[in-house]
Amino acid sequence: MSEAQSELQASLLAKALPYMQRYENKTIVVKYGGHAMGNAELGKAFAADIALLKQSGVNPIVVHGGGPQIGAMLTKMGIESKFEGGLRVTDQKTVEIVEMVLAGSINKEIVALINQTGEWAIGLCGKDGNMVFAEKAHKTIKDPDSNIERVLDLGFVGEVVEVDRTLLDLLAKSEMIPVIAPVAPGRDGATYNINADTFAGAIAGALSATRLLFLTDVPGVLDKQGQLIKELSVAQAHALIADGTISGGMIPKVETCIDAIKAGVQGVVILNGKTAHSVLLEIFTEHGAGTLIVP
């Protein structure tokens, strides 16, 4: 390594030090999904980021999705995907596949990636330690012609109703990094598939996490000129939804951020998971890497 390279590395570490101190012993929940999950190099970079957070004294918790992988497995098993109002209907056969893919193959792949860095990850879902309980989701859709709302029956799609932080508190005191699949039981004995974003928000809220990071396929919230908005308050986010600046699929993402803040999360960040080491850039640099939403 040349002298110039050594000086550059030393400078970068010196700049990162205040942020490492700021987040020491703090909980950061990272929702991992999107393009990064299907890219081997980005997956390794993500695992390295999570490992470095742990090594820096942070308490990282990973929550992951897996929609495309679920769809691929359903096709492979010859099970037709059904949709109501654009939302997947999860019948008994489908929820069994969902649990197999999310809590099985995907979860263990992420655990293995983190373990390869030398850290110690453990794979979980909402069933473990009675961590999360869910109930059947109640979704409605409005007919554009009649303006009449009707209730959608999405089967075993659930909403989080209770989070018990006991297991996560125990893991925070250990060397383990929890990797959690968004599958949870109901008090009725059923198994429910839960939207990974809202699941991550519920976990982060229950832990009063310092940060909740959503890794997406976009840089963050953009203004009407297509430029990244670095920071928004909840009130500003509501205003941008009202005036159409925030639209389409970004609306439910931002609404989930707002719900998480109301639940006790100190700040939520939407950032681009397609950028290698975006987690480290967000946490350990002055300007971050996405859009920070705060109370």
UniProtKB/Swiss-Prot annotation:
Pathway: Amino-acid biosynthesis; L-arginine biosynthesis; N(2)-acetyl-L-ornithine from L-glutamate: step 2/4. Coiled coil: none annotated. Its main location: cytoplasm. It is an enzyme of class 2 (transferase). The record marks K31, K253 as: Transition state stabilizer. Its EC number is 2.7.2.8. CDD domains: AAK_NAGK-C. Keywords: Amino-acid biosynthesis, Arginine biosynthesis, ATP-binding, Cytoplasm, Kinase, Nucleotide-binding, Transferase. Belongs to the acetylglutamate kinase family. ArgB subfamily. Catalyzes the ATP-dependent phosphorylation of N-acetyl-L-glutamate. PANTHER family: N-ACETYLGLUTAMATE SYNTHASE (PTHR23342), N-ACETYLGLUTAMATE SYNTHASE, MITOCHONDRIAL (PTHR23342:SF0). This is Acetylglutamate kinase. The gene is argB.
